[in-house]
């Protein structure tokens, strides 16, 4: 008997997030990318803003310890999941991915403040942090639920690893230089054999990440589907396909000297020949809160520099580079200023 229930029954059993009311938020958790130079001051600004709104503040334990935000109670990520009504993440998309996965089962809404580079998920800039958050707490906001994937590694008749992914699940050749042979099935249908560097299974959120670099489609977050994108396939006719989220994708490693699976590029597991990776929609989702007026297409246009001439894009890139510390001494100086 298969260790997994039919895909349809799993889809029907997904939890439905309760309606979110900002007026009910009494306690907010703060998580920061604490190893980033200069992040201490924005975190202190954020905490002061929340206290000024009459909101209790909890600071994630590692953030509290390393940034010395000891004026506020500290809590682990799991504790934030049970104690906080809302969590604000200050960092880049990588930080947001990690926090989202850890809090997904708790159903805690998240707001992202961008202290990184692109900021697809952390869409509020530091310069407008207080203004944007004031609008949110005044009720001028947009809420959206983003899907997650769950990927299980089956070896023989045992599930050896299971984890969630917000962006993507990647099965690839690991550290070995040769290709890997994979067999792909969707539901009960055999699809194809692939000889390639790997394959990306991307959520709509992840469609603007690794998948886009591998020529996968950009999928709007409201579309209940994910993309299956081959990485450098040997046969040029192997193309990306979009799969409905009620399906189950099974990828079997049929031949490989070395192979691995990666969840959001942050956790991984080695694979051997015969291993099956079973991917399906997770029973939980990530709830993102944006200021009113958030526009996905405007975000794409801004982040991906659509409608800009090549010359203006080059100038923008040069300005970004000029603001980036170019050596250890400059980074050290930034850290001293932040302290």
Question: Residue spans of the language-model regions?
Answer:
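ATP/NTP phosphate-donor binding region
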Residues: 1-86, 90, 127-142, 153-163
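Gly/Ser-rich helix-loop-strand patches that form or flank binding pockets
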Residues: 103-113, 120
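Short glycine/serine/threonine-rich phosphate/pyrophosphate-binding segments
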Residues: 39-40, 94-100, 208-213
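Gly/Ser/Thr-rich active-site loops/lids in small-molecule metabolic enzymes
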Residues: 189-237
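A residue-level signal for conserved active-site and pocket-lining positions in enzyme catalytic cores
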Residues: 33, 88, 92, 114, ...
